[in-house]
Design a protein with these regions (language model features):
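Gram-negative bacterial Sec-dependent N-terminal signal peptides
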Residues: 8-15
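C-terminal motif of bacterial Sec signal peptides marking the signal peptidase cleavage site
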Residues: 17-20
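Bacterial N-terminal signal peptides that target proteins for export
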Residues: 1-8
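A sequence/structural signal for flexible, mid-protein segments enriched
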Residues: 22-305
Length: 305
């Protein structure tokens, strides 16, 4: 996920204040600033616990060269609510922004279970204030999987006999109780030479293109039937920017992460007023702590003859 942009944008969330009604105008000041713990973390069923980002918000006039954003000294505790077990997490430094976070580094096995309930508690000192936040997630239940992708190899925006553009389609087996599914498309052969310049969605100059603006796309479906059964997801052509192989990952998503994704960029009401995204935290927290079950398939995009 675009973890870096989420962390930085979430850090700004505590310093934006709407002072207008109906006009769609935002006045950004430091008047409403209060220190907050900013969390961005996911538990993935069957995967290690890692990359739990814990940072802070900051004032707009803050010198970020002198103000550490990551709360490396925070006390971060993962709680397995079903087993009544506590797991203190350790900060792992890394040159990679995405990998700089808290993780489970003990020899004791820690397996995130489908259907399990977990809480995250964070205690940290920010600007002399003792802050605390807590969030709880229930991992989607077992049963989710990708059943089929059709076609697995296709020309870019291929057409059927009637001249209609064919959209690749993924069939999934749903996780009982889960109604939100996220599809991501990641190019595996990304380069200036494989970028699809002849597309109807943008006009890019090969000499100026920033490939990393196009290296990750996502779509979702929501409000699917609650019970077990199959649903279909389309891979839209505006999510495909390169010829070659693409990894398609679909996630069955818990309520916390779904609420964040649904509200993170939709913060303006029809009347022009603004609201915060939906943060499922108690206490002094912003951001998201959620969970998901992933499954993966691949598609190859061919050049037209």
């Amino acid at each position: 996920m675009r973890q870096r942009s989420f962390v930085l944008a979430l850090s700004l969330a505590g310093v934006v204040q709407s002072l207008s009604c109906g006009e769609g105008v935002v006045s950004v000041t430091n008047q409403s600033y209060q220190p907050r713990i900013v969390v961005s973390g996911l538990l993935i069923a069957g995967h290690p616990v890692e990359d739990i980002h814990v940072s802070r918000n900051f004032r707009l006039d803050e010198n970020l060269n002198e103000t550490p954003i990551f709360l490396t000294e925070a006390a971060v505790l993962l709680i397995d609510e079903d087993e009544a077990a506590n797991y203190p997490l350790t900060f792992v430094d890394s040159p990679s922004f995405e990998k700089r976070g808290f993780a489970w580094r003990d020899d004791t096995p820690l397996a995130i279970r489908a259907g399990g309930t977990y809480s995250l508690e964070v205690r940290a000192t920010v600007e002399g204030q003792e802050l605390f936040t807590r969030a709880t997630t229930t991992v989607p239940g077992a049963g989710f999987e990708i059943v089929d992708l059709t076609p697995e190899r296709t020309e870019y925006r291929a057409r059927d006999g009637a001249g209609n553009v064919i959209m690749p389609e993924v069939t999934i087996e749903r996780s009982p109780g889960t109604t939100f599914y996220l599809l991501t498309a990641v190019p595996l052969d990304m380069s200036v030479d494989t970028f699809i310049y002849d597309n109807p969605f943008s006009d890019e100059d090969p000499r100026k293109i920033d490939l990393f603006d196009f290296n990750y796309e996502f779509e979702w479906i929501q409000n699917t039937p609650v019970g077990a059964g199959q649903s279909k997801m389309g891979l839209f052509w505006w999510d495909v920017w390169f010829y070659g192989r693409h990894e398609i990952v679909i996630y069955a998503v818990d309520a916390n992460w779904a609420h964040f994704l649904q509200t993170f960029e939709e913060v303006q009401e029809l009347d022009g007023n603004f609201h915060e995204p939906k943060f499922e935290f108690e206490g002094d927290g912003l951001g998201y702590f959620g969970s998901a079950i992933p499954d993966t398939t691949n598609i190859e995009i061919l050049r037209s003859d």
